[in-house]
């Protein structure tokens, strides 16, 4: 974990260029820790700590380096480039745009390092073949296994570089959704977990504000049976902003956008008006949900049903507080009536992934937050004789 070098880390500082700006940083601190903890460049991701996974890849004088294996003093006087510098003009670099177009990111954790390695590759070989791509990315591990799409993204980046007049993609992070709240100022939370409370007893409006709530209760689950996921609710406010709940959703497979589209189609509202509330994991800042593949078959139909029922009782008036509990089986819209699906929506969070703006639990910082780390002895069989834990009691 970054940030653990100790109280003497700032005794001596050196100057290095980071994204074109001269920075004075502690000489003995790891480059990874300095970039993240000192400069707030959290697009550089901690991973294995041994230079094996590539999630912390940066460019040093244009060449890929694992930041976890370098001290700041190693890059004194050199030019360090992180993912944050690529889209600083407000539009995506062609490599980033290619990753978005192809959908080359899934969870997005390895993506900043991948993008920088591809950038260095194209600087050396403008039109690489698959073998050259594989060799260049050998130091970057994708835990989700999206390597075929990453290769296609590299070829697409070459095409974008050869095309004149191609409009660059907007680099605005999370452009099609509104924030659920900052971890340091979290949104209101239920007084009692809603999955342990009957729908009519939940404090809907204290948490979500005035509006219409439609609930599809969970079906009784037979012992030993597979969950049907047939439980969902949504809230529509006076401005036609919709919050929908489906339990946990996938990350990276774009089910989040697909589930939002179901709601948008049924309610005839823009996709940007719909946000998803994940289940219990939504209480963890920057949590990415679950990594399965059953979000759509488990949750999709139930979500479409609550949206279809909501459509029959709209419009919503300002100041309205109304809860509708579904007892029948609402008729959902046929796919032939859809207007927004299939029209080229950018996958949820993909721009965040390629720009380094996507946040994970390891990126959370709070006032007074302490860091822990495993400190290994320099000699085999060494024994800890003394520990200064005074800072922990401050």
Predicted features along the sequence, with ranges:
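Alpha-helix C-terminal capping segments
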Residues: 59-61, 266-267
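Short, hinge-like loop/turn segments at secondary-structure boundaries
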Residues: 62, 125, 292-293
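Ferredoxin-type iron-sulfur electron-transfer modules in oxidoreductases and energy-metabolism complexes
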Residues: 27-41, 69-183
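Glycine-rich phosphate/pyrophosphate-binding loop shared by adenosine-nucleotide-utilizing enzymes
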Residues: 65
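Cofactor-binding beta-sheet edge motifs in enzyme active sites
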Residues: 2-17, 22-29, 42, 48, ...
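Flexible glycine-/small-residue-rich
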Residues: 18, 60, 82-84
């Amino acid at each position: 974990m970054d940030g653990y070098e100790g109280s003497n880390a700032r005794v001596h500082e050196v100057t290095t260029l980071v994204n074109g700006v001269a920075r004075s940083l502690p000489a003995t601190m790891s480059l990874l820790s300095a970039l993240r903890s000192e400069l707030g460049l959290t697009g550089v991701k901690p991973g294995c700590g041994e230079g094996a996974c590539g999630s912390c890849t940066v460019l040093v004088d244009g060449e890929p380096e694992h930041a976890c294996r370098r001290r700041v003093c190693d890059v004194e006087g050199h030019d360090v480039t992180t993912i944050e510098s690529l889209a600083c003009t407000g539009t995506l670099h062609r490599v980033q745009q290619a990753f978005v177009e192809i959908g080359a990111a899934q969870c997005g954790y390895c993506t900043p390092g991948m993008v920088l390695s591809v950038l260095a590759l194209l600087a050396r070989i403008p039109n690489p073949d698959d073998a050259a791509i594989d060799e260049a990315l050998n130091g970057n591990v994708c835990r989700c296994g999206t390597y075929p799409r990453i290769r296609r993204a590299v070829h697409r980046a070459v095409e974008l570089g050869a095309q004149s007049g191609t409009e660059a993609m907007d680099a605005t992070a999370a452009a099609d959704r509104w924030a659920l709240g900052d971890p340091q100022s979290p949104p209101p939370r239920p007084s009692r977990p809603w999955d342990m409370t009957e729908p009519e007893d939940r404090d809907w409006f204290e948490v979500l504000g005035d509006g219409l709530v439609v609930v599809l209760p969970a079906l009784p689950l037979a012992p030993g049976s597979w969950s049907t996921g047939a439980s969902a609710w949504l809230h529509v406010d006076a401005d036609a902003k919709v919050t929908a709940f489906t339990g946990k959703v996938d990350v990276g497979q774009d089910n989040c956008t697909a589930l939002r589209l179901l709601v948008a189609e049924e309610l005839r509202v823009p996709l940007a008006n719909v946000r998803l509330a994940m289940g219990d994991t939504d209480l963890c800042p920057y949590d990415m949900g679950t990594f399965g593949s059953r979000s759509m078959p488990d949750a999709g139909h139930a979500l479409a049903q609550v949206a279809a029922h909501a459509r029959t009782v709209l419009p919503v008036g300002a100041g309205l507080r109304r809860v509708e509990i579904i007892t029948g089986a609402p008729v959902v819209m046929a796919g032939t009536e859809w207007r927004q699906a299939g029209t080229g929506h950018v996958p949820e969070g993909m721009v965040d992934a390629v720009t380094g703006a996507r946040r994970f639990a390891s990126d959370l910082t709070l006032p007074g937050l302490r860091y822990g780390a495993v400190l290994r002895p320099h000699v085999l069989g060494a024994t800890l004789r003394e520990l200064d834990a005074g800072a922990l009691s401050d």
